[in-house]
Amino acid sequence: MESESSQDDWSAFDPMSREYYDQVGNRYTNESGQKLIMEAPLPPKDEKEQRATRQAKYPYLVVPKSSPYVTEKMLINFFGRALIKEMEFRRLSRVYFVYFENIASLETAQQRVQRYPNLIKCITGRPQKEREITSDPVTSTEPMPTPGPAISATERTPVNHNREVPISTGGQNHPEFFRPPLVTKDDYKRGSLLATNDPIQRYLNVKYEFALERHDIYKLKDETRIPQVVLHFRSGRTIPLSTVAVTEEDKTKSLLEDGVSKCVVCQNWTDTFCKLCKMPFCNASCFADVAEQHKQACGKGEILNLDEKVGRKYPKPGLPPSGSKVRITAFEQTNVVYVRSADIQIDIAYYTVLTEVMMLGKDASKLQSTPVCGQIVLYKFEGHMSRAMVLNVDNIKEIYVVFIDFGSVEVTQLERLYECSSYLAGLTCYPVAVKLRGVPRRFVGPNIREVMYELDQSLVFNIKYSSREYDTSKGMQVVVMTEIDINRSLNRLFKTILTPVEPSVSDLGYKEDCLPYIPLHCGKNINVVVMDNTFIQCGFIYCTSIDLAYEVTKMQRDIQEYGEKIAKCATYAPPINELCIAKYEGKWRRGLSVELVGDGYPSILFIDYGNIVPTHVTDIRPYPPQFIFPIMTTQLDLIGVPEKPTDEQIKWLDKNYPIGSVITCSEITFDEETNSYSTRIEKLQEFLSLD
């Protein structure tokens, strides 16, 4: 018996068992102390029942842990914390069960999975066994109620008029203003100066697209990085400073020292001479004009006595052949540009013309009478004289001229115009207007302006065209231009800048502060245009100047194109104080969300006009970042209007200040404390004093 008990005692003896079964010694860690073996928590007893309840109550996705990067935090960041109701990880099957609040959240999550299929893979569905839950049988014999139709985001429900922000009434159309054409066919009647100086009727379709610079909204000295472009003055013109600075005597001396003389025919500088008599000629064309006279005088030391009609003083103007190199002199529209040949002979002749106009124009006298359409005059710009052709003199205070040596259109007054001699008027004009193929005509906004200003005359472009693409209605050749240095297509660049891109709904919107603002001019006897009067009973209207009213209408063409053909978002409800593109009376306009009431009709303030209208979400689109157009409409308070006007007073105000009318303000003032504009109108004061 004793031997058996001793054997039992020894069998229980195991000195290593304590260390083997001790959990403290069985923790495996790496160098940084991180556990390599995770301890699985004990599952609760009712885990299966709870899981079945969750799967029956909430829609879910099954995400397998296909890689170590698929973690709980990664799924939260991927789907969004707002969509996820709960999350469960099964260690044995190594899958995540992601539960969502509702079906809409599930569909949103599925769309994200479909958009990025390489990140995660999901298994949708619900096992039949786990979905079955024991419940008491329904003992009621009454039929189940028929579910109502699902609410559609595109359904137009009744408008909730219980709003904090007042809305406009009346449903009047927004006013449209179109600038009268600068030149008409009547100006080209037989015998007129315009018909003589513009035989191809190029200026019949000329446009003035740079009106915003007159209101100091675009300042070249601040906008551009190229110092020389300051002399472009809103359209690409360049005055060669080196040509102006160097005097004729110093330039002649330096050229003679380099073995350069003036051509006996065209009087341009050249280093080409006859080998026998050392007579200078520019090229074979100049030599051919005086070949007979040179043959008789060559080697005899005689000087050629040439008539003024002999030879061409300047190379022949016109559009160079396809494949030639050109330089840009000015931009008229987004798709119309003035170019000249970059040939060295044209360069010399072009700057010679500019220099001659500057030098001889110093002694010109001012115009004493109103010029006529088509007359060549001199215009003083930045202290230098330039040749210009008068296009429109309907308003003596706003005379439209085109700089024939550049191509740009300018508005000036009689005091800045000078008489042009017949000699200067007869000098050759080299810039030619061409139309960029595939580039639409759009509003000249900040983005395209900055590019225009930076395209200096130092840049050389390769021009290509086909004579079959000549636009006879506009009098221009359709061309493709490519910058030689970096092989960049000017047509493609302009088209990319001018085409707006619809932002994603998930992107942050744009505030009203992102847009520049052009305020009203303060002073006396100022004419303004009424853009909206729906809040006239509150004592204010929305106005702008006549010039800016043209720009507002011109801007709508781009916005309409975006709303009809580019924006594809079916529904959009912009947050409060964010910009959007909204439809009003069938036309797309710029808007600002001012109130959301949950009925599908956000209150939209149309910032270019001033009315506030509940607009359905199907008629709203996200605001594209390319539309950095300035706000040109201002709220104008009417001094003297009572806080609660009578019906008779409201009727009188609506009649005398209708939408689209031009009114004369006796005085416009600005209050810095309230940041508001107000006006005093004598006619209004007289009416209110009678009451």
Curated annotation (Swiss-Prot):
Its main location: cytoplasm. GO terms for cellular component: cytoplasm; cytosol; P granule; Yb body. InterPro entries: Tudor, Tudor_vreteno-like_rpt2. Gonad-specific. Keywords: Cytoplasm, Meiosis, Repeat. The keyword Repeat applies. Gene3D superfamilies: 2.30.30.140. Residues 366-427, 573-630 form the Tudor domain. It is found in: Cytoplasm; Cytoplasm, Cytoplasmic ribonucleoprotein granule. Disruption phenotype: Both female and male vret mutants are sterile. CDD domains: Tudor_vreteno-like_rpt1, Tudor_vreteno-like_rpt2. Changing P602L: In vret(49); ventralized eggs with no defects in somatic gonadal cell patterning, germ cell differentiation or oocyte specification. 'Vreteno' means 'woolspinning spindle' in Bulgarian, referring to its eggshell phenotype. Interacts with aub and piwi. Gonad-specific protein essential for germline development to repress transposable elements and preventing their mobilization, which is essential for the germline integrity. Acts via the piRNA metabolic process in both germline and somatic gonadal tissues by mediating the repression of transposable elements during meiosis. Required for primary piRNA biogenesis in both germline and somatic gonadal tissues. This is Protein vreteno. It comes from Drosophila melanogaster (Fruit fly).
